Curated annotation (Swiss-Prot):
This is Putative olfactory receptor 13C6. It comes from Homo sapiens (Human). Glycans are attached at N5. It is a multi-pass membrane protein. The lineage of its organism: Eukaryota, Metazoa, Chordata, Craniata, Vertebrata. Pfam families: 7tm_4.
Length: 151
């Protein structure tokens, strides 16, 4: 009697979602789509305002614009797949698509942590050392620290 070592590789995952309540999927699709459009519109307006208004070319607004861009990237990496899973009858995600989505989520989360720490430093300098703020957070000072962040 020969025992064979049988292994199966995982190629896709089954998304259960709201299988017990299929009528709610269309309602959730509309709600999530509306929230996604509000996110895109709100962050897009903030980015447009910080880029177009020369009075807002300061570190605080620069970081807020980058945070808005990062928020758009973060939601765009996951929401379209969620919306697609509500519409299609086959509710699966491939292993590679899952790995890419996980990587993007971790990368965006890490970038957001770095960006929020830079924003915290900016506000710390503005509140605790207001007279030194123009020197510490000059364009020559904050441009090199923003290079790891996108935008």
């Amino acid at each position: 009697m020969v025992s064979a070592n049988q292994t199966a590789s995982v190629t896709e995952f089954i998304l259960l979602g709201l299988s017990a309540h299929p009528k709610l999927e269309k309602t959730f699709f509309v709600l999530i789509l509306l929230m996604y459009l509000v996110i895109l519109l709100g962050n897009g307006v903030l980015i447009l305002m910080t880029v177009s208004n020369s009075h807002l070319h300061m570190p605080m607004y620069f970081f807020l614009g980058n945070l808005s861009f990062l928020d758009i990237c973060y939601t765009t990496s996951s929401v379209p797949l969620i919306l697609d899973s509500f519409l299609t009858p086959r509710k699966t995600i491939s292993f590679s698509a899952c790995a890419v989505q996980m990587f993007l989520s971790f990368a965006m989360g890490a970038t957001e942590c770095v960006l929020l720490s830079m924003m915290a430093f900016d506000r710390y300098v503005a509140i605790c050392n207001p007279l030194r703020y123009p020197v510490v957070m000059s364009k020559a000072a904050y441009m090199p620290i923003r290079l790891p962040a996108p935008g």
